[in-house]
């Protein structure tokens, strides 16, 4: 049975070991891992510069400004917090469970009276701050030591402002079974239990409302870090050096890894999506939403794909007809069509992660990544008997001119179901112009509400 550890155990470990780690890891007291320019050629002298490079990379992705208020979780001796304040002019509040390290951070901060810095001893599972206190939360090499990790993540969500950024790196456990050697040299030595995998971490974050905009598996860099740390520790601490070698073996066996996540606090995912101003951001948001999209929208939105599919079925009874599901997302329309007996459905969406969810439902004969703003080259012209378009032409999404590209894929006499928000349909002049321009006629209008009060309309059109 996995041994249980407490925060008191972790605090005692770091209070006791600070001076030892300074002697070979980083003389300034930071305990981070390196992000290397060239993994194959890195040498021991490259380790500390690689740690600094990782700080610089995280900062580049953070969006910190002079207006930012940052919570640094696991601030240690305060080096990174001070560096962030120096680089950006932001305010940084650092917390750590180690009284020794917080004391070191406070002493170091006195050398920088012009910077907005404060440090205190606190646990991330019970943050002593009010809701929505910070624009950013930053953490490095810390959360694996938190034994109530989901509680900690919910606390981080609580203190972040709406659409605030949480960026962090952490150890992960890629596999579920850990060898006795892995338990001894990794988990028991560092006083923590096997944690999330790369994928389950992202899913848990999203379920809490911390939408993962960017993620990186850094396990190769962790392996190189411990290879070099083994060299650096060998002369003074041969047993520790041997443990680092064992950690490299654990990394090779996928019993240990390292990952990075950049998240955004989002309490209302629908408004978040509609408020997008550029295509790349929209794609990133849908990729972030993919794993929990169905769970979020099942009760209040499912009627839209179901009624859109039925609208097509009313005019296209042939169950073997070729159908294109545009903006297929996680496959809700495909599921609804399959439930009605259709067997030849193709999906297209611009989000890779949404399509991966759709693929697992096994209702499509083919799935393609594509953007309706451009010609869809996976198909020849006039290839489909029916096309369903849901959630594509709306606020913050595709321009109505994309309808021209879809029109080309529909057979003469084919049917096109275009489902829209009523307010978008009635207010978008470009949409009205293109609908009138294309050679088709409206056969039916199906009106309904999503999210209880949001009016929708499904237009059923036939191509001349």
Regions found by a protein language model. Give the residues of each.
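Class I SAM-dependent methyltransferase SAM/SAH-binding core
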Residues: 71, 77-126, 324-376
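Short alpha-helix
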Residues: 193-209, 425-439, 457
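N-terminal auxiliary segments of SAM/dcSAM-dependent transferases
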Residues: 1-24, 267-277
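A short SAM/SAH-binding and catalytic strip from SAM-dependent methyltransferases
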Residues: 136-148, 385-399
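Conserved SAM-binding loop and adjacent beta-strand
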Residues: 18-19, 23-56, 294-310
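Short, glycine-/aromatic-enriched active-site segment of Class I SAM-dependent methyltransferases
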Residues: 171-192, 417-423, 429
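A short glycine-rich, Lys/Arg-flanked "PGG" loop and its adjoining helix->strand segment in the class I
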Residues: 150-165, 400-412
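A short acidic, Gly/Pro-enriched loop at the edge of an enzyme's catalytic core
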Residues: 125-136, 377-387
